[in-house]
């Protein structure tokens, strides 16, 4: 009988406050009690999106899309990480760009995905809505800019003149676009003609930032230089719309990553910041025109007093022009490297700014601002969100006996989490933690550090009970408890294994003389010295054996009671990083930096199997309770589920974005927890769904085939390769259509071809029957032809062939429709034209879906015009002419209806205004107007 296993799926992911994408600030909602406050911040949390309340530090909501990793229908690849966020506040839309080039548009009110766009081949670097929120512009690492229509749900066109990643753009209405790239160029695009009309060298190296305020444009490069440009869109002179005005130096020598403007609505004072690729943000104030004029006048006067000529004065003023426009304001310095920033509010007394850091925190700053006081106070950090995540990598995790609490240890902090609510309930300061363990009862946690310290924490009192600073002379890499929890075993890089006992001692209460409290303390018992550094120690569940991994690539097994040597397990080529022993103490597994897992028997020390398990160092292995199945995690960012008896991989769990450092298994085996370098903590829960090994292997092979097929289509290889653009010559234009083959578009094309096969066969069968019937009616020879029986599918859905094909077309997303049509071979193009010809005879269907029919027909003809022109089939020519005539008639009728309806609406509006709108006019002005107006001529009535 085929063996089945229970499937593990991701039940939760937490611990990430802000990942690599930018942050978006939204003001406090009007539903709040006071309607004010620092508002909310939208941040990326790897593949998800978090919305935080800045004041309370609470997670308001989390936006997640798609199947959970590990699900039966989930793809065998890690989910794409969010790379850019952009919100349109008037429409409550949030556009999210991902590392695989996908763009999803969310509705912030309903927390659902409205639109999916897939046109880029690399990660999204920039997104921007237009003023109305009906168009979205995206930039990517593939050097292309795409303009998307949110109403039509399609990509309008692709601008592809840059040679490297897009780093900035600015859009004015529907006419102009300015873009910068890492190729060092700044380009001005005319969006009406889709052409680049100006190109300038922005910086000698890469250009990293762009921002525009009125006619002022600022760009940043790879060094401390910042360029100021003058923007004059109305200038018709060739190359005169964008001119360089000057250069100024910022304080930081690192590149400027982002520039953003903000204006005080009360006094029209404008500020901007430059986010540097370090721990600083520099803010600047833009001087008003009166200030600039006064400064120029004073400078000119001083230069004249020095005896300079008019030319020298003009040259000097031009060189220092940037100092007249900009005034350095304040510099914000964070403790951590800054990932992104955003202005929040500005008033006459302060500026407020929020930022996210590389250490998984959100910081909110207030910059005091006094007009009359040039020496403003330093920026103040008013809010911080850091409780729900750790600053550095989680190196060790453990689960309490009752499966309710989770301990995570990192450099500088130990956090205790509620597994059910995923909230941090305790935070302790500690050293550089390498290993931690819950004591029986779940109220005490023991922790080992890189400095050789042992620290014992009490969760109930939130205090540090005991610290042994000289527990070891080097890093404590591993610790374990005996099954009764009374003894502790620690292994260190000082080549010793130490045994500790827990004892209760009376401790003097601080501030008293004779009051004592019982406190649990650690007491050193014995020491086992070995020849090499110890990386891992593990006590068998029956307390019989102690397994120790050494730096010499071996694992030595001792009897725990007598400390006598029992077995030496050798065979790994690199040090063993993790050990675990099965529940029956009969099997031991070891994982190593050589990417292998070895399964050994503890009776004779024989190696049952050696598995090449991962693509990088395997950091941890854990048996499931009461089972020989086990989990492993690696630096290749994958968690794997194995059968230790059949030596087969049951599941590959892709979710983490980077190295997975630690694993912990619940005492009942109901869930597994993993932690990673990406700051995320993920809970993998056992489900009722069953896993069959053969099905998983087939699924993996299918995914590999699909990926290969998509790659061949994109690169132009294989029989079903991508066809060239309709322009056809192979010359790369600055603008092109938005096309990208995806698995969804391929499947949509296949569904359409199946519908065409079924529908056209039915249509041709009916046409043949009608011809035979007419011939029989004329000659009356033989028996009358039998009407063919309809297709069972059409009878079941009660539709005609053309209705069935039209329904299939309607079910394809608009953003995938053209890509689905591009998949069809030319034989199916002819069938599609036959379908259009049939629809022309069905006036009801034609007028109901005229826009869709026209769009598909025009695209098919444009895309296949060379093949169609070369056809010598007279029937095809007649068919196309017939379609042209019928379509023109239908479009003319629709145009007439539209004109009639527009005029009718205008008349209704006029009548409504006459009845409801009244204009109040001054009596004196009205009399004067009537007296000045010409008297109308009176015509007599002739009877």
Curated annotation (Swiss-Prot):
This protein's GO CC annotations:
90S preribosome; nucleolus; nucleoplasm; Pwp2p-containing subcomplex of 90S preribosome; small-subunit processome
The record's annotation in SUPFAM superfamilies points to:
Nucleoporin domain, WD40 repeat-like
UniProt protein name: U3 small nucleolar RNA-associated protein 12
PROSITE patterns from the entry? WD_REPEATS_1, WD_REPEATS_2, WD_REPEATS_REGION
Q: Which CDD domains match?
A: WD40
Q: Name one GO biological process term.
A: endonucleolytic cleavage in ITS1 to separate SSU-rRNA from 5.8S rRNA and LSU-rRNA from tricistronic rRNA transcript (SSU-rRNA, 5.8S rRNA, LSU-rRNA)
Q: Name one GO molecular function term.
A: snoRNA binding
Per the similarity annotation, which family is this? Belongs to the WD repeat WDR3/UTP12 family.
Q: How does it assemble?
A: Interacts with snoRNA U3. Interacts with MPP10. Component of the ribosomal small subunit (SSU) processome composed of at least 40 protein subunits and snoRNA U3.
Which SMART domains has this protein been placed in? Answer: WD40 (SM00320)
Q: What is the lineage of its organism?
A: Eukaryota, Fungi, Dikarya, Ascomycota, Saccharomycotina
**Which sections of the protein are WD repeats?**
77-107, 119-149, 161-190, 202-230, 389-418, 428-458, 471-501, 571-601, 613-643, 655-685
* Source organism (scientific name): Saccharomyces cerevisiae (strain ATCC 204508 / S288c)
Statement: the UniProt record of this protein carries the keyword Amino-acid biosynthesis: no
């Amino acid at each position: 009988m085929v063996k089945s296993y229970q499937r593990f799926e991701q039940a939760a992911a937490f611990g990430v406050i802000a990942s690599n994408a930018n942050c978006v600030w939204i003001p406090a909602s009007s539903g709040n009690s006071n309607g004010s406050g620092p508002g909310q911040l939208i941040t990326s949390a790897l593949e998800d999106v978090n919305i935080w309340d800045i004041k309370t530090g609470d997670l308001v909501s989390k936006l997640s899309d798609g199947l959970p990793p590990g699900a039966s229908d989930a793809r065998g690849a890690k989910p794409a990480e969010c790379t850019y966020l952009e919100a349109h506040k008037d429409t409550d839309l949030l556009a999210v760009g991902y590392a695989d080039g996908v763009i999803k548009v969310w509705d912030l009110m309903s927390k659902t995905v409205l639109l999916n766009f897939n046109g880029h081949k690399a990660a999204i670097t920039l997104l921007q809505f237009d003023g109305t929120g009906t168009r979205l512009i995206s930039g990517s690492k593939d050097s292309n800019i795409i303009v998307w229509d949110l109403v039509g749900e399609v990509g309008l066109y692709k601008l592809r003149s840059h040679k490297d990643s897009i780093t900035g753009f600015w859009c004015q209405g529907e006419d102009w676009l300015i873009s910068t790239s890492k190729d060092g160029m700044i380009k001005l695009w005319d969006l009406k003609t889709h052409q680049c009309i100006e190109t300038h060298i922005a910086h000698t190296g890469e250009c990293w930032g762009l921002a525009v305020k009125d006619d002022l444009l600022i760009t940043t490069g790879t060094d401390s230089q910042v360029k100021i440009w003058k923007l004059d869109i109305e200038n018709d002179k060739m190359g005169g719309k964008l001119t360089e005005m000057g250069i100024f130096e910022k304080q930081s020598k690192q590149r400027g990553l982002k520039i953003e403007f903000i204006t005080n609505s009360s006094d029209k004072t404008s500020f901007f910041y430059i986010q540097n690729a370090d721990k600083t943000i520099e803010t600047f104030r833009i001087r008003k025109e009166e200030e600039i004029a006064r400064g120029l006048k004073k400078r000119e006067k001083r230069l004249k007093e020095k005896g300079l000529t008019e030319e020298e004065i003009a040259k000097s003023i031009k060189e220092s022009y940037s100092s007249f426009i900009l005034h350095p304001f304040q510099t914000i310095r964070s403790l951590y490297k800054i990932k992104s920033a955003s202005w929040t509010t500005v008033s006459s007394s302060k500026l407020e700014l929020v930022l996210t850091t590389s250490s998984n925190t959100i910081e909110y700053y207030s910059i005091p601002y006094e007009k009359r006081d040039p020496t403003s106070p330093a920026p103040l950090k008013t809010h911080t969100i850091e409780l729900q995540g750790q600053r550095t990598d989680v190196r060790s995790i453990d689960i309490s006996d009752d499966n309710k609490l989770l301990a995570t240890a990192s450099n500088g902090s130990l956090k205790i989490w509620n597994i059910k609510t995923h909230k941090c309930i305790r935070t302790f300061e500690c050293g550089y933690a390498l290993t931690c363990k819950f004591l029986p009862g779940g109220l005490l946690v023991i922790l080992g550090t890189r400095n050789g310290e042992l620290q014992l924490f009490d969760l109930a009192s939130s205090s540090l009970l005991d610290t042994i600073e000289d527990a070891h002379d080097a890093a404590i890499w591993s610790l374990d408890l005996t099954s009764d929890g009374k003894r502790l075993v620690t292994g260190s890089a000082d080549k010793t294994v130490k045994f500790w006992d827990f004892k209760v001692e009376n401790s003097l209460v601080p501030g008293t003389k004779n009051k004592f409290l019982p406190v649990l303390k650690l007491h050193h018992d014995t020491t086992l010295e070995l020849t090499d550094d110890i990386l891992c120690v593990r006590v068998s569940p029956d307390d019989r054996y102690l397994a120790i991994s050494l730096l010499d690539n071996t694992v030595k097994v001792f009897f725990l009671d007598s400390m006598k040597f029992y077995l030496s397990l050798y065979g790994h080529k690199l040090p063993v990083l993790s050990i675990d022993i099965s529940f029956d103490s009969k099997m031991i597994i070891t994982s190593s930096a050589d990417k292998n897992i070895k399964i050994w028997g503890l009776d004779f020390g024989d190696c049952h199997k050696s598995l090449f398990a991962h693509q990088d160092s395997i950091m941890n292995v854990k048996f499931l309770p009461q089972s020989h199945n086990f989990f492993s995690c690696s630096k290749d960012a994958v968690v794997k589920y194995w059968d230790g008896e059949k030596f087969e991989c049951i599941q590959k769990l892709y979710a983490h974005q980077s190295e997975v450092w630690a694993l912990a298994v619940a005492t009942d085996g109901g869930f597994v927890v993993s932690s990673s370098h990406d700051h995320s903590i993920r809970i993998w829960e056992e489900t009722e769904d069953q896993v069959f090994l053969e099905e998983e292997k087939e699924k993996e092979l299918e995914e590999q085939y699909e990926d290969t097929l998509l790659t061949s289509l994109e690169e132009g290889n294989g029989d079903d390769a991508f066809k060239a653009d309709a322009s056809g010559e192979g010359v790369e234009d600055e603008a092109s259509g938005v096309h990208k083959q995806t698995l969804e578009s391929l499947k949509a094309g296949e569904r359409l071809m199946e519908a065409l096969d079924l529908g056209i066969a039915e249509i041709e069968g009916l046409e043949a029957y009608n011809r035979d019937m007419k011939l029989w009616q004329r000659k009356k020879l033989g028996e009358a032809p039998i009407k063919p029986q309809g297709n069972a599918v059409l009878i079941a859905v009660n539709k005609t062939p053309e209705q069935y094909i039209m329904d299939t077309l309607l079910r394809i997303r608009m953003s995938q429709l053209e890509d689905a049509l591009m998949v069809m071979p030319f034989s199916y193009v002819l069938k599609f034209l036959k379908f259009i010809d049939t629809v022309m005879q069905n006036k009801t269907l034609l007028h109901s879906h005229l826009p869709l029919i026209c769009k598909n027909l025009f695209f098919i003809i444009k895309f296949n015009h060379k093949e169609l022109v070369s056809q010598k089939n007279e029937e095809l020519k007649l068919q196309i002419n017939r379609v042209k005539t019928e379509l023109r008639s239908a479009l003319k009728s629709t145009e007439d209806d539209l004109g009639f309806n527009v005029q009718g609406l205008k008349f209704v509006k006029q009548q409504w205004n006459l009845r409801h709108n009244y204009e109040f006019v001054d009596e004196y002005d009205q009399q004067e107007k009537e007296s000045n107006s010409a008297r109308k001529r009176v015509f007599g009535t002739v009877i």
